[in-house]
C-alpha cells in the first residue's frame, strides 16, 4: 500500500512542476521561468538553480510514483507511455483542492504535467490525475513524444477545454 500525508506544505503548481522535473532529470532544479510571448519561448534558455542531492532517493521514489499511476490513486492518468506521478488532496477553509504532479518516461520528449483543481469532493486528487492523463493521451495521439524536433508555441490542446470521463 502506498500512502502519504502532508500538512502545512505550501507550494505553487509551478514549484511542484520544478520539483517533478528535478526528480525526472536526476536532481537538477531549475529557476522558474515563464516565457511571456512566442519570441521569449523561441529564445528560452533554462537556468540551473542548484543540484539536489536526491540521486540515491530516486530509485525509491520513482517506482512508487509509477505504481500510483499503474494501480493507485493516479490510475486515471495511465497512458500507453510510462508515466510517474503523485496525487494529493488538501482542504483549506472547507474548500477542497486536488492536485496531480507527473512526468513521462518514454519517447524522445520529456514532459512534466501538474494539474490543480478546486472544489468538488475531498477525493479530487484522482480527478486531477485524469485531467493530466488526457493531456498525455492527446499529446501521444499527435506523436509529440516520438519526435525530438524543437516545437515553438503551445500545442493546440492547451487552449481547448479538456474533460475526462475515465
Model-derived features: positions:
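Short, highly charged C-terminal tails/helix-capping segments
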Residues: 146-166
